[in-house]
Amino acid sequence: MLNIGPFSFHSRLLLGTGKFPDFDVQQKAIDVSEAEVLTFAVRRMDIFDAKQPNLLEKLDVKKYTLLPNTAGAKNAEEAVRIAKLAKASGLCDMIKVEVIGDDRTLLPDPVETLKASEMLLEEGFIVLPYTSDDVVLARKLQELGVHAIMPGASPIGSGLGIVNPLNLSFIIEQATVPVIVDAGIGSPADAAFAMELGADGVLLNTAVSGAKDPIKMAQAMKLSIEAGRLGFEAGRIGRKRCATASSPLEGMSVVE
């Protein structure tokens, strides 16, 4: 089970809802992924205008936990305003904090992310900050009392996969809250690797919505995350420089 604050989920796959070709493909991909948590950008959806069609109208929202995010925020104050808008609309108190500090790389602003997380915790939100693979920043966020850490594998939408597995492993080893690898996942192998490192979950979007067949990719991601978690729990063998025979040598007959 993936436990985040008061919530418990069977699926360790969190799925973003943007960039799908159409609502039908989106719905089918969500269904086969078996994701229980769906994230969306509040600023890209007019949640107060009943005339504007959006995700919330198309989905049976009772089946899912919705995770609004603060994408588009440039500072802590903007992130808090967006989070409060989501809460005022009757959505979940759980919020993904996303404060971008650089438009080219879309990497998060560490100072504003810390500030926004602290402010939202004081407001009673369940806070999941998107952060870089900075080990010290992850620890400081954890010390604030956030409910999960969401380090990026690589820049948002890049599909580069996990570019710094060492840092991710350090973040996971020191964590006392769930670690959900977020951003940059490009393939099922990337998702499985994140889980093999010991991540508690993976959040992805473009890897599915941008695939040639988003529905098949959603299923592939589901299976790879399950396989990666099983592999982590099973415990991989150690790496060795030299070969070790897989068959015992004792009792073998000698051919003369």
UniProtKB/Swiss-Prot annotation:
Active-site residues, record numbering mapped to chain: K96
Catalytic activity: [ThiS sulfur-carrier protein]-C-terminal-Gly-aminoethanethioate + 2-iminoacetate + 1-deoxy-D-xylulose 5-phosphate = [ThiS sulfur-carrier protein]-C-terminal Gly-Gly + 2-[(2R,5Z)-2-carboxy-4-methylthiazol-5(2H)-ylidene]ethyl phosphate + 2 H2O + H(+)
Residues the record lists as binding 1-deoxy-D-xylulose 5-phosphate: G157, A183, G184, N205, T206
InterPro entries given in the database record: Aldolase_TIM, Thiazole_synthase_ThiG, ThiG
Gene3D superfamilies xrefs: Aldolase class I
Coarse class of the protein's main subcellular location: cytoplasm
A Gene Ontology term for the protein's cellular component: cytoplasm
One annotated GO biological process: thiamine diphosphate biosynthetic process
Keyword list, A-Z: Cytoplasm, Schiff base, Thiamine biosynthesis, Transferase
CDD domains in the cross-refs: ThiG
Compartmental location: Cytoplasm
Pathway: Cofactor biosynthesis; thiamine diphosphate biosynthesis
GO MF annotation terms: thiazole synthase activity
Enzyme Commission number(s) of this protein: 2.8.1.10
PANTHER family: THIAZOLE SYNTHASE
Assigned protein family: Belongs to the ThiG family.
Quaternary structure (record): Homotetramer. Forms heterodimers with either ThiH or ThiS.
Job description of the protein: Catalyzes the rearrangement of 1-deoxy-D-xylulose 5-phosphate (DXP) to produce the thiazole phosphate moiety of thiamine. Sulfur is provided by the thiocarboxylate moiety of the carrier protein ThiS. In vitro, sulfur can be provided by H(2)S.
Full protein name: Thiazole synthase
Protein source organism: Bacillus cereus (strain ATCC 10987 / NRS 248)
Name of the gene encoding the protein in the UniProt record: thiG
